[in-house]
């Protein structure tokens, strides 16, 4: 296997405030590894909250700072709601205003663009203007000529515009909804990206490390009403979409990659599920559960022999064809 090109993909799922679990895992891993965790991966994919983390890691923001962003600013993102939103949220308006999220992102990323990022990244969203999935990427292929101009803040708002939780996000490319609608667990997109754009003509070895958010499987109780309008579905409809999508991707990646696929995630106990079931619940209980389980999950992964290839891998410096970090001659583009 020595001479085979090897690509490692980091895939970070969405999950609202439960992204604190993901950020805790990343912070613990980065502390032990002793260098930016992005340097261990040839591509970082992230959806919604995972998209924000992916963008942060690609900018080489320390993982412990991203963890603090969730823990310290969660109440600003999912915090106090106006009276109209308390009365009409879920029904006629989104439950939360996106102003708090935008403020937090702007304070952290300011005017940083996708082209300023130091590592390859892929962030899915749904372009509601076209009705199609859209994948924001660094310019790691000659044909990726536009996204490098986009501000990281705008991409983060697009991938995190969860239906009924936040308003749709508008930027220069259109109107966007949460990336969880097209791929809450983006590992399959990462595998496709490597096979199609990074190593299209090579017999490459691809490994995927997926980190979840303690997503609670969306299920129906035995005695629940089967005749449901929006009043009964509410946020449960979006939860079902991301839960079903995550389980499908997990199954397909296990079949496609075998031991070259490694997932870090946890199932909440019945008691803990009361704290973390809602993706916008910011409370002491939720914070403690997500951090405690994230710390334990990282320790468990570090001791697993199947994790060792991710620990040992050093990604090559990425090639960028456009933007401020362009590092290839014009003729090669």
Curated annotation (Swiss-Prot):
Disruption phenotype: Deletion of the capV-cdnA-cap2-cap3 operon (plus neighboring gene Q024_03603) results in about 10(4) higher titer of phage PaMx41 in this strain.
UniProt KW Lipid metabolism keyword: yes
Gene Ontology biological process terms, A to Z: defense response to virus; lipid catabolic process
Principal EC category: hydrolase
Catalytic activity: a 1,2-diacyl-sn-glycero-3-phosphocholine + H2O = a 2-acyl-sn-glycero-3-phosphocholine + a fatty acid + H(+); 1,2-di-(9Z-octadecenoyl)-sn-glycero-3-phosphoethanolamine + 2 H2O = sn-glycero-3-phosphoethanolamine + 2 (9Z)-octadecenoate + 2 H(+)
Motif (GXGXXG): 14-19
Result of altering residue 48 to A: Loss of defense against phage PaMx41
One Pfam entry name: Patatin
Record EC number: 3.1.1.32
InterPro entries, per the entry: Acyl_Trfase/lysoPLipase, PNPLA_dom, Teg/CotR/CapV-like
Induction or repression: Part of a CBASS operon consisting of capV-cdnA-cap2-cap3.
Catalytic-site annotation from UniProt: 48, 178
Protein name per its UniProtKB record: cGAMP-activated phospholipase
Lineage summary: Bacteria, Pseudomonadati, Pseudomonadota, Gammaproteobacteria, Pseudomonadales
Gene name linked to the record: capV
């Amino acid at each position: 296997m020595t001479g085979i090109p090897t690509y490692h993909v980091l895939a970070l799922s969405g999950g609202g405030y439960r992204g604190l679990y993901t950020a805790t895992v990343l912070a613990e891993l980065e502390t032990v590894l002793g260098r930016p965790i992005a340097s261990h991966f040839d591509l970082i994919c992230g959806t919604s909250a995972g998209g924000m983390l992916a963008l942060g890691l690609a900018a080489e923001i320390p993982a412990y700072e991203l963890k603090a962003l969730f823990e310290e600013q969660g109440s600003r993102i999912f915090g106090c709601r106006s009276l109209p939103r308390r009365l009409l949220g879920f029904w006629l308006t989104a439950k939360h205003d996106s102003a708090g999220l935008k403020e937090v992102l702007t304070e952290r990323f300011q005017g940083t663009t996708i082209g300023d990022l130091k590592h390859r990244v892929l962030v899915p969203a749904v372009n509601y203007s076209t009705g199609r999935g859209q994948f924001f990427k660094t310019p790691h292929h000659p044909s990726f000529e536009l996204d490098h101009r986009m501000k990281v803040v705008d991409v983060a708002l697009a991938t995190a515009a969860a239906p009924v939780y936040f308003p749709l996000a508008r930027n220069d490319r259109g109107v966007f909804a949460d990336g969880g609608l097209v791929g809450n667990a983006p590992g399959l997109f990462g595998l496709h990206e490597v096979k199609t754009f990074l190593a299209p003509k090579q017999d490459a070895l691809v490994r995927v490390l997926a980190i979840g958010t303690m997503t609670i499987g969306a299920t129906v109780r035995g005695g629940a009403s089967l005749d449901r309008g929006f009043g009964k579905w509410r946020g449960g409809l979006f939860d079902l979409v991301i839960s079903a999508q995550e389980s499908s991707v997990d199954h397909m990646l296990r079949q496609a990659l075998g031991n070259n696929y490694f997932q870090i995630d946890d199932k909440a106990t019945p008691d803990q599920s009361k704290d973390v079931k809602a993706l916008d619940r910011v409370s002491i209980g939720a914070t403690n559960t997500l951090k405690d389980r994230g710390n334990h999950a990282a320790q468990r992964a570090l001791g697993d022999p199947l994790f060792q290839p991710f620990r040992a891998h050093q990604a090559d410096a990425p090639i960028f064809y456009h933007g401020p970090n362009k590092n290839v001659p014009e003729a090669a583009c």
